[in-house]
Amino acid sequence: PRSTLFPYTTLFRSETQNYARLMQILSDAQENQLWMAITGSAGSGKTFACKQYSRDHQEVFYVSCDPDWTKREFFSVMLRKIGKEPSGLTLIQMKQKLVLQMRCLESPIIILDEADKLSDVVLNSFITLYNDIQYDCGVVMIATEFLFKRFDTGVRFNKKGFNELWSRIGRKCVP
């Protein structure tokens, strides 16, 4: 029952459950090199939980996505996250360096917060990335429900790469 003095008791309990659930999903994804998408409402605590998970665990690379990134900018950010300098490298060399580094780690995970903000071109680059590191690294895309809508629309209208990417994350978004 809700208190009239403190009407948000249910909300905080719900957020705590969301937090615990998301932490467990991230742990499973990291331990088992899972590729998945998780969606939730704005303000549901996704970002907080992901940042906390990245602080509490090793080999976690948290990235807050930007809608203006090109593929080159995305891979530059990824290399910097793993402590490598992208200067002077071609896009192919950046991808190769990221793949090699992920393969050298025991159980890495990349958390892409606000993944729904990434351009189609950047999202499509995950198809080959998946092919290269699917057994070496987990990748979790975190977003609002708009990510599911993008995948759904992309698959229904046969947009380049969406069916392949959708299959690589198990043809679902975890709500």
Predicted regions and their residues:
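Mid-core helix/loop region of P-loop NTP-binding domains shared across ATPases and GTPases
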Residues: 70-77, 85-125, 131-138, 160-161, ...
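Sensor-1/coupling segment of RecA-like P-loop NTPase cores
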Residues: 35-42, 118, 130-160
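Pre-Walker A adenine-sensing motif
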Residues: 15-30
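Conserved catalytic segments around the Walker B and adjacent sensor/switch elements
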Residues: 57-67
